[in-house]
Every structure is written in structure tokens, then in C-alpha cells.
Amino acid sequence: MKTMILLLCLLGSAQSLPKQLNPASGVPATKPTPGQVTPLPQQQPNQVFPSISLIPLTQLLTLGSDLPLFNPAAGPHGAHTLPFTLGPLNGQQQLQPQMLPIIVAQLGAQGALLSSEELPLASQIFTGLLIHPLFPGAIPPSGQAGTKPDVQNGVLPTRQAGAKAVNQGTTPGHVTTPGVTDDDDYEMSTPAGLRRATHTTEGTTIDPPNRTQ
């Protein structure tokens, strides 16, 4: 009984194995000799990955489609297309000639490159704006600005406003005194025996009072 079961198992396993057919003769191939090398059958890509033909990779893998967004001035004419092969698929890769890679690194105290593990927790970033002195719109330093023309005509405090008006009309070494105003300005009356003061160019003189006879 055991031998019958064993024979049936061997027979079933022999029938389940695929048979190799010789395309020239059309008969099943015999066992190869020890010196003969059996050629391996070539498998098609669709047999290994049958689902790759169902995925539209040409629409998903569009390399360089976002590069014109960074440089719209170049347009489609400024981009160079390079063909590449991705298995059974073909596509085009767009490269901008004026785009260069940017490498950002942080230097240590001795000028050595630091890895991400050696970087300090609180990174310090220094920003600034450099303006050329001859660039239009640049602000010169305070020491080189020179005297402004508005300083001479500037507004002075109340106590110095009168002194400025007097100093503009004076010359060094000559000081003039304001003339004596009339008595009406001071609300004073001249006595009967005195004369009013007479105005002169060099000052004021007062005549002696007339003696009554």
C-alpha cells in the first residue's frame, strides 16, 4: 500500500513539471549530457513586472518640469533637453545651463566643517546689508558728510533768536547801539526847563537846561 502511494506521488510530480520542447524537431528534449550547457529562456519585462505597463510613468516621471518656474525669463528655448532611458520607457530631461548647485556648510571655530551631530543647538545666523559708498542712494558716514547748508538757516531757540539778528548786521570791532526812541514810546513827558534829546549819528547829546531869568 505504501509503495502504491509512493508511485502515485512520483507520477503526479512528474506530470506537474513543465516539458521542454525542441523548436527544431518538435519532440521533447532528452536529458542533456554533462558537457552540454542548457540555454536559459529569456523572459520579457512584462512577464516579470506585468503591472509596469499599466502605470503611466511618462506622466508621473517628468523630470525638470518645475525648473521653468524658477527662471521664467529663459522660457522653453533656454532649456536643453537630454534623452534618457528608463527601462522600456523613454523621456526627456530638462536642464538649465545657468543653474549652478549651491553648497551650504557651517564652519567651526578653527575653520573645519562640522557635521550635523557636532553643530550647536542654537545656531547663530548673522545677516547684514552691504552698500557701496559710490552706489546711488548710499548714506555717507557722519564724519564725511560735511556741513549741511540748512544748518546756517536753521531754527534757533527763543533766547538766541534776537542775538542772531543783531550779529548778522555787526562787524568785528564795531558795535553799534540802537538809537534812542521817542519819549512817546516810554510814555514820559519832558519837563518845561529841559529840551528833548536830539538824535545824532554817533550817539545822543542832551543840552543843558535853560536858566530862567
UniProtKB/Swiss-Prot annotation:
Coiled coil: none
PTM summary: Phosphorylated by FAM20C in vitro. O-glycosylated.
Pfam families: Amelotin (PF15757)
Tissue note: Specifically expressed in maturation-stage ameloblasts.
GO biological process: one example: positive regulation of enamel mineralization
Region (Disordered): 22-43, 162-213
Compositionally skewed regions (Polar residues) per UniProt: 33-43
Alphabetic keyword roster: Biomineralization, Cell adhesion, Glycoprotein, Secreted, Signal
Signal sequence region: 1-16
Low complexity biased stretches: 169-180
GO cellular component: basement membrane; cell-cell junction; extracellular matrix; extracellular region
Compartments, record wording: Secreted
InterPro entries noted in UniProt: Amelotin
Main location: secreted
Family of this protein: Belongs to the amelotin family.
Biological role stated in the UniProt entry: Is a promoter of calcium phosphate mineralization, playing a critical role in the formation of the compact, mineralized, aprismatic enamel surface layer during the maturation stage of amelogenesis.
Record's protein name: Amelotin
Organism: Mus musculus
